[in-house]
Amino acid sequence: MSTKLQDHFDKITKILSGFGVEGCISYGEITFSIRDQRDIHLILKKLKKEYLFEQLTDVTAVDYLTYGQSDWQVGKVVSQTGFSRGRQQDFKTAAVDNRFEIIYQLLSMANNVRIRVKCKLKDAQIILVDSVSDLWPSANWAEREVYDMFGIYFNNHPDLRRVLTDYGFVGHPLRKDFPQTGYVEMRYDENLGRVVYEPVEIDDRVNTPRVIRN
């Protein structure tokens, strides 16, 4: 580990000492985890002001709904029975606390350091965090994309609309319980002279399963 990286880590840890934040250095990268999502805006504002993180390079999220679940149960019996291909997807779609994690990538050009700041969203019923578009204008569209793909709402965002999917789109495509086939398909109808939407007729099947070996 470089001494410069450790020095940056120690200084930032001191700045955030009054908050519920845990930090680590792993694979040459600094990561801080915020315990309370209500502190996100205040902490990021403090980092921008006191350690000159003038650039927000990305905002994204992760859905941990199926984390640790295997499509195929791998055991000794597999060698005798083989695998069952084309299995139907079976997601547990009930609200799960800590299901979503929001991630911010920050860059300080003045200090020549990048950090990752992330926070698990505790309440699965109210998926809401404060927007940081007032701190970094680049957050505007990035937060719109996170809302579009994951359904995470950003409080005080100036224009929280979908940015990638079509008008009237139902659902959020990067959620783990969103079917890979989608819900509707579109085609051009020559008789009507316009694009029409129809229910998907493709079976949602797992042909390339995720296997977790312990």
Curated annotation (Swiss-Prot):
Query: What GO terms are given for molecular function?
Result: NADH dehydrogenase (ubiquinone) activity; NADH:ubiquinone reductase (non-electrogenic) activity; quinone binding
Keywords from the named record: Cell inner membrane, Cell membrane, Membrane, NAD, Quinone, Translocase, Transport, Ubiquinone
List the EC numbers from the record.
Answer: 7.1.1.-
Write out the catalysed reaction.
Answer: a quinone + NADH + 5 H(+)(in) = a quinol + NAD(+) + 4 H(+)(out)
The region annotated as signal peptide is none
Task: Report how it sits in the membrane.
Answer: Peripheral membrane protein
**Any single Pfam family the record assigns to this protein:** Complex1_30kDa
Q: Where are the transmembrane segments?
A: none
Q: Is DNA-binding given among the entry's keywords? A: no
GO CC annotations on file:
plasma membrane
Q: Where in the cell is it found?
A: Cell inner membrane
Q: How does it assemble?
A: NDH-1 is composed of 14 different subunits. Subunits NuoB, C, D, E, F, and G constitute the peripheral sector of the complex.
Q: Which HAMAP family match?
A: NDH1_NuoC
**NCBIfam families (UniProt xref):** NuoC_fam (TIGR01961), PRK06074.1-1 (NF004730)
The task this protein performs is described as: NDH-1 shuttles electrons from NADH, via FMN and iron-sulfur (Fe-S) centers, to quinones in the respiratory chain. The immediate electron acceptor for the enzyme in this species is believed to be ubiquinone. Couples the redox reaction to proton translocation (for every two electrons transferred, four hydrogen ions are translocated across the cytoplasmic membrane), and thus conserves the redox energy in a proton gradient.
Tell me which family the UniProt entry assigns to this protein: Belongs to the complex I 30 kDa subunit family.
The name of this protein is NADH-quinone oxidoreductase subunit C
